[in-house]
């Protein structure tokens, strides 16, 4: 029997059924890459997700921002832009990545391995 970790159960409560389907699709795509480093760097497009699931820009942003909030996905890492001596990172939902936590969360929740 599959063990679901308690913190995973709490996260499941915070996801809509559509978000779960999207995470499944991201996982299936990520799972094709066996190399951990390459898998970590895989990026997904908001535009492609919007087309597949027929989402408006606003709906896609809400979903992606919720996945960021739950630390299941993240914006791609970058060095940002320097303004004077201060650097800041650009925040985007146009392109996003699975976090390692997100990948293992979906793996733990999948019943049909």
Residue ranges and their predicted role:
Residues 50-82, 91-93:
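Short amphipathic alpha-helical interaction segments
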Residues 31-32, 82-84:
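Short, solvent-exposed loop/turn segments at secondary-structure junctions
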Residues 7-11, 63, 101:
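Short, hydrophobic/aromatic alpha-helical segments in well-folded domains
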Residues 3-53:
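Short amphipathic alpha-helical interface segments
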Residues 27, 69-72, 107:
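Charged/polar positions within long, soluble alpha-helices
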Residues 85-113:
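Short, amphipathic alpha-helical interaction segments positioned at domain boundaries
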């Amino acid at each position: 029997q599959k063990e679901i970790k308690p913190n995973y159960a709490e996260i499941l409560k915070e996801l809509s059924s559509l978000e779960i389907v999207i995470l499944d699709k991201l996982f299936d795509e990520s799972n094709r890459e066996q190399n951990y480093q390459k898998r970590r760097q895989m990026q997904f497009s908001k535009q492609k997700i919007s087309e597949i699931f027929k989402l408006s820009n606003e709906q896609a942003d809400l979903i992606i921002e919720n996945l960021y909030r739950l630390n299941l996905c993240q914006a791609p890492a970058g060095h940002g832009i320097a303004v004077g001596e201060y650097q800041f990172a650009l925040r985007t939902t146009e392109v996003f990545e699975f976090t390692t936590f997100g990948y293992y969360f979906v793996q733990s929740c999948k019943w049909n391995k």
